[in-house]
């Protein structure tokens, strides 16, 4: 999963327009242009596509935390110079204010099951003996689950049915 993929999915999940995306970066005290945002959101095969580096992605995630949870007083956290799926998952957990049970439920929406122990291994320090690297499949399923939770398709409305012609005649 590339940083650009994560950025595109978060934009879709939260239904953010370009101005809102610029605002999220501004929440982390970084100014970006509409053109930069547009280039990051383009498809990988587009000639104007520009790759989002780890520091820029970390800045966006810090801004997302500030945007969704409110900015804390004092100095802002420094963006990490290199990211991995574990850090991205942790920052999304913080931004969406999710507990372990809620993360497991989001993964379950996508039909992906993990135990609490497997999940907690993703949030441990890399030196810890029970640390586990978060694979692309887990992050992809988590983002897909968030999409189902926060941005359901219109045709996913459970229990909806059109009234039959018989009902109208009565």
Residue ranges and their predicted role:
Residues 1-2, 33-35, 165:
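Short N-terminal segments
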Residues 27-31, 41, 45, 57, ...:
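Solvent-exposed, non-transmembrane amphipathic alpha-helical segments
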Residues 62-113, 150-152, 156, 163-170:
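Short, solvent-exposed interaction modules
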Residues 20-70:
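Acidic (E/D-rich), amphipathic helical modules within compact regulatory domains
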Residues 8-9, 31, 60, 74-76:
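Short, flexible segments with low predicted structural confidence
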Residues 10, 16-28, 35, 40, ...:
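A structural feature that tracks compact, well-ordered secondary-structure segments
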Residues 3-6, 11-13:
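Leu/Val/Ala/Ile-rich N-terminal alpha-helices, chiefly Sec-type signal peptides and the beginnings
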Residues 48, 52-55, 59, 72-86, ...:
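Intrinsic, low-complexity N-terminal interaction/targeting segments
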